[in-house]
């Protein structure tokens, strides 16, 4: 049977990383829809209203085709992309990682930002509980009674 990896709904993974007085708070969540993502990001923006940046990335679907990364004002590809990279490196899906940055007064540069967001995301994912889920599909067949033996034989072969 096919399966996919995700993180548990029961526990929010948390991580804390500092670099040159900047503080990075990271959180990983299980999500099922883009609406879940929007709601959680809005909650973090409200809770950490005084933070300089609230950057995030998500991956959705067992085929891992629905994803997005957001830098929230950081230089292009220095925040969201490294966060998404951590999700990808673990082959996870149905996951949102949010990283909140409090600026410490010292600029980190492009490579410093990439490392900081990557490390913070990794810490949050390390703290989460990974799960493997089976892909389930319900299939309904309609057939005549005469075909019963053939259908049963086929269904046993493909289960």
Question: Which sequence ranges carry the predicted segments?
Answer:
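Positively charged, aromatic-enriched nucleic acid-contacting surfaces
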Residues: 75-92
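Hydrophobic side chains in well-ordered alpha-helices
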Residues: 37-40, 117, 151-154
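Conserved small/polar residues in nucleotide/adenosyl-binding loops
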Residues: 157-159
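Stable alpha-helical structural segments in soluble proteins, enriched in small hydrophobic residues
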Residues: 116, 120-128
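Glycine- and acidic-rich phosphate- and metal-coordinating loops
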Residues: 93-103
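C-terminal regulatory domains involved in ligand/effector binding and gene-expression control
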Residues: 1-78
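Short glycine-/aliphatic-rich beta-strand segments at the starts of folded cytosolic domains
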Residues: 131-145
